[in-house]
Design a protein with these regions (language model features):
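Short, well-formed alpha-helical segments that are part of the catalytic scaffolds
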Residues: 37-50
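Catalytic beta-strand/loop signature of glycosyltransferases that borders the donor
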Residues: 143, 204, 217-223
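Catalytic core of nucleotide-sugar-dependent glycosyltransferases
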Residues: 167-169, 226-229, 235-259
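Glycine-rich, basic loop-to-helix element that forms the pyrophosphate-binding segment
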Residues: 86-104, 126
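Acidic donor-binding loop at a coil-to-helix junction in glycosyltransferase catalytic cores
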Residues: 199-206
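Conserved donor NDP-sugar-binding/catalytic core segment of glycosyltransferases
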Residues: 122-154
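Short beta-strand-to-loop acidic/aromatic patch adjacent to the donor-nucleotide binding site
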Residues: 107-118
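A conserved acidic beta->alpha catalytic loop
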Residues: 60-71, 88, 114
């Protein structure tokens, strides 16, 4: 699996030379946004295995009933945890921007995780090593196992591995699963950070912009388990998300046939009930693995 990821990165288009070679440390800052998530935060933190020189930042987005301060330990497996508390609920985009802006300047990599999602023990060492060996890659994700609220396995999302395939998929939808992403801090800054103009699709908007500064890849191994089906953002704000996706596709539209398909597909999904799209997606995953 890892060899195929390395071969894929070796075929990257090399659109950046400096972003991977700044000489700063290879430390990771993991940013976890939190809002009234309770024990889901504990579940996520318990799964994290990083170096003691790394950092975990939890951003409490104005919780009143279940503030994160009552839940987080000072360290997780020797990795320090820092809490940032926002005075009022401002949304995930602002929480992420605040968390990342608070990361020490000499941390090369920013990682993401959502409350309730969990990591494979080797996630961070695998992705750190991959980015360290491939300076042209500014963003790396992995395959992801989706589970039900009770933890039952639903399906594995096998995102494209090759940087060329990632770019092709980005013309249709986001090719990097957000909670599995790790990216270079410098590329994030060059892209302008998480934009506020694309609600429910801030990850897609950021990653599409980051591809102007380098390549992206996915490690062909399931390194994250994501919980779904319990009222997450894709369920509550599906139409908002689809509108944002259309706007992102239009912003980066290049006339490629896949770009045309992606835009028409997003428009069609706005007229399709969520349960139909979910059913079709699961069938596609079973047939293609993607």
């Amino acid at each position: 699996m890892m060899q195929s990821a390395d071969r894929a990165a070796g075929r990257s288009t090399g659109r950046t030379g400096s972003l991977g070679g700044t000489g700063i440390t290879d430390r990771i800052c993991l940013v976890i946004p939190y809002y009234e998530a309770g024990d889901d935060l504990v579940v996520s933190l318990t799964s994290v295995r990083m170096r003691r020189t790394d950092l975990i930042i939890v951003v409490d987005d104005g919780s009143q009933q279940r503030p994160a301060r009552n839940l987080i330990p000072p360290t997780v497996a020797d990795t320090p945890v820092r809490l940032i508390e926002l005075e009022k609920n401002s949304g995930i985009t602002m929480a992420l921007r605040t968390g990342i802006s608070s990361a020490p300047g000499d941390f090369a990599f920013i990682a993401r995780l959502d409350c309730g999602d969990t990591c494979h023990p080797e996630r961070f060492s695998t992705q750190r090593d991959f980015l360290s060996r491939h300076p042209d890659i500014v963003l790396v994700g992995s395959w992801v196992d989706f589970v039900s609220p009770d933890g039952s396995f639903l399906y594995r999302l096998e995102q494209p591995v090759d940087p060329t395939a990632v770019r092709k998929r980005m013309r249709v939808n986001c090719a990097i699963t957000h909670p599995a992403a790790i990216f270079r801090r410098e590329a994030y800054d060059h892209a302008g950070g998480y934009p506020t103009a694309y609600p429910a699709a801030e990850d897609y908007a950021l990653f599409a912009q980051m591809l102007k500064h380098g390549d992206a890849a996915n490690i062909p191994q399931s390194l994250v388990r994501c919980r779904t089906g319990d009222g997450g953002i894709s369920d509550k704000k599906r139409r908002t998300q689809l509108v944002s996706r259309c706007r992102i596709l239009l912003k980066h539209f290049d006339g490629h046939p896949m770009a045309v398909y992606g835009l028409l597909r997003a428009i069609g999904q706005m007229a399709t009930p969520r349960r139909w799209s979910t059913w079709a997606h699961r069938i596609r995953v079973k047939l293609t693995g993607q």
